[in-house]
């Protein structure tokens, strides 16, 4: 999810997180709140709860002229809400979900693409996860 957020909104300028073991069911944090400010001045908040009574998988992006809602883990419809109207957009399942990623890597190795292979995006995602989980702040 955090990698998708940075893909959609760009590089992070600063992020702050608060996590706690609210349920005490396991020895691990199960509730996390995060605030992110991106280098392009977009701001957002994240709320994750792994102990709720409801199993809900939804990302909501509220923009100045509409709202997007979609699942992170399923291929459910994307919902667009604009001007008090709701639209549903569906996507067909692809047979091999990893294939576009693998193709870009192969094409990069063959010199036909410039897919980033430095691992910096994975590192930035891991830094955000640790920032939220450790209830700290990170700045770039």
Where would I find each of the regions flagged by the language model?
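Short polybasic amphipathic segments
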Residues: 59, 75-83
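Broad, structure-driven detector of short, well-ordered beta-strand segments within folded domains
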Residues: 66-71
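A general structural signal for well-ordered alpha-helical segments in protein cores
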Residues: 1-2, 98-106, 129-130
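Rossmann-like dinucleotide-binding domain that binds NAD(P)(H)
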Residues: 1-43, 49-54, 120
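Generic detection of short hydrophobic beta-strand segments and adjacent strand-loop junctions
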Residues: 87-92, 138-140
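Glycine-centered tight beta-turn/hairpin loop motif at sheet-sheet or coil-to-beta transitions
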Residues: 39-43, 65, 84
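C-terminal helix-rich "cap/oligomerization" subdomain common to oxidoreductases
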Residues: 39, 105-140
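Active-site loop of classical SDR/Rossmann-like NAD(P)-dependent oxidoreductases
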Residues: 91-103, 117
């Amino acid at each position: 999810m955090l990698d998708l957020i940075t893909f959609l909104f760009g590089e992070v300028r600063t992020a702050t997180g608060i996590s706690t073991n609210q349920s005490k069911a396991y020895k691990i944090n199960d509730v996390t709140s995060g605030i992110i400010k991106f280098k392009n001045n977009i701001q957002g908040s994240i709320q994750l709860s792994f102990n709720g009574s409801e199993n809900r998988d939804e990302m909501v992006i509220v923009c100045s002229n509409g709202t997007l809602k979609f699942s992170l883990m399923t291929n459910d419809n994307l919902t667009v809400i604009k001007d008090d109207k709701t639209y549903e957009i569906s996507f067909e399942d692809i047979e091999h979900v990893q294939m576009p990623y693998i193709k870009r890597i192969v094409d990069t190795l063959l010199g036909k693409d410039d897919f980033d292979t430095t691992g910096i995006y994975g590192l930035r995602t891991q830094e955000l996860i640790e920032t939220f989980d450790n209830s700290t702040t990170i700045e770039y």
